């Protein structure tokens, strides 16, 4: 039986999950998830968001409980570091820089790239590198390694297709979703008012641009996965301390990738800034008055 706790609507409201895009940008397929509009901005029905989030979290919990693998995907700037942080926190996998076509459907090619990455790392760490290669050659190998690491760090230990795909921003990650559909991999996804919920098995209506919203989603996803992992370990009799060892190693990799991204001087987006109320029914009348959401 699932241990997933009920979702707090106030928490969703405080994170700005209810802010959709401007009404001119909406996707009619999202109509049933929209509560109303204010100042030409759609307001998402958080009662549905809370209910559907619970369903999605239960899917994550059950997947990990049965020793399944989860692949978190979001390559947008404001979600990149967050999704890596929480995927690694729960010992799962992620793609947060660029989705390479065929990451799921052409795994052999991706596996070759991972093998190349590991070979470069081994060469650069060896004494042979100092003796057999010039500084220019070493620099060239380092650049190739860094480029591969940005794309593959989160899946380098993924030896088979994932059992569940978790996506933030279905528009940006449509290629990943299409590949998952071809392989019959179920998809959990945050769907904003400009999104297409088709091909999403577990849709979660919500703001997919706000950093605060994204962090809340990822925190909930990771907690559900950790609960599933804990249950799985109890059943199999595995020492739960091994989970921490796995997470520590993953976090080291995450810090390395984060430094690589900082060296590219990627711009950062700002948090959503708006007034929140204690009851969702008040959101339509007041929460949009200070409408500086990330969605436009």
From Swiss-Prot:
Cellular component GO terms, alphabetical: cytosolic small ribosomal subunit
Record PROSITE patterns: RIBOSOMAL_S2_1 (PS00962), RIBOSOMAL_S2_2 (PS00963)
The organism's place on the tree of life at top rank: Bacteria
Keywords carried by this UniProt record: Ribonucleoprotein, Ribosomal protein
GO MF assignments: structural constituent of ribosome
KW Ribosomal protein (keyword) present: yes
SUPFAM superfamilies noted in UniProt: Ribosomal protein S2
Region annotated Disordered, chain positions: 252-296
PANTHER family: 30S RIBOSOMAL PROTEIN S2 PROKARYOTIC AND ORGANELLAR (PTHR12534), SMALL RIBOSOMAL SUBUNIT PROTEIN US2M (PTHR12534:SF0)
HAMAP family per record: Ribosomal_uS2_B (MF_00291_B)
NCBIfam families: rpsB_bact (TIGR01011)
Protein name per UniProt: Small ribosomal subunit protein uS2
Organism: Rickettsia prowazekii (strain Madrid E)
Gene name as annotated: rpsB
């Amino acid at each position: 039986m699932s241990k997933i706790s009920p979702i707090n609507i106030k928490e969703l409201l405080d994170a700005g999950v209810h802010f959709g895009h401007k009404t001119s940008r909406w996707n009619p397929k999202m109509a049933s998830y929209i509560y109303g509009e204010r100042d030409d901005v759609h307001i998402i029905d958080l009662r549905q968001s809370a209910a559907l989030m619970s369903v999605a979290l239960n899917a994550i919990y059950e997947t990990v409980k049965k020793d399944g693998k989860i692949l978190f995907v979001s390559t947008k700037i404001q979600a990149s570091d967050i999704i890596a942080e929480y995927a690694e926190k729960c010992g799962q996998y992620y793609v947060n820089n660029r989705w390479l076509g065929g990451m799921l459907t052409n795994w052999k090619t991706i596996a070759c790239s991972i093998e190349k990455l590991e070979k470069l790392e081994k060469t650069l760490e060896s004494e042979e590198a100092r003796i057999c290669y010039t500084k220019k050659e070493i620099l060239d190998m380092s650049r190739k390694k860094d480029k591969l690491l940005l794309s593959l760090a989160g899946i380098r230990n993924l030896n088979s297709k994932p059992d569940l795909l978790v996506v933030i921003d279905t528009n940006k990650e449509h290629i990943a979703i299409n590949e998952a559909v071809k392989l019959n991999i179920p998809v959990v996804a945050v769907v904003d008012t400009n999104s297409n919920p088709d091909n999403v098995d577990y849709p979660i209506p919500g703001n997919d641009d706000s950093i605060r919203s994204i962090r809340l989603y990822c925190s909930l996803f990771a907690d559900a996965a950790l609960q599933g992992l804990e249950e799985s370990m109890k059943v199999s009799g595995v020492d739960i301390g091994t989970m921490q060892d796995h997470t520590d190693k993953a976090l080291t990799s995450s810090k390395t990738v984060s430094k690589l991204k900082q060296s590219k001087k990627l711009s950062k987006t700002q948090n959503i800034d708006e007034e929140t109320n204690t009851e969702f029914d008040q959101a339509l009348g007041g929460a949009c008055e200070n409408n500086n959401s990330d969605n436009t």
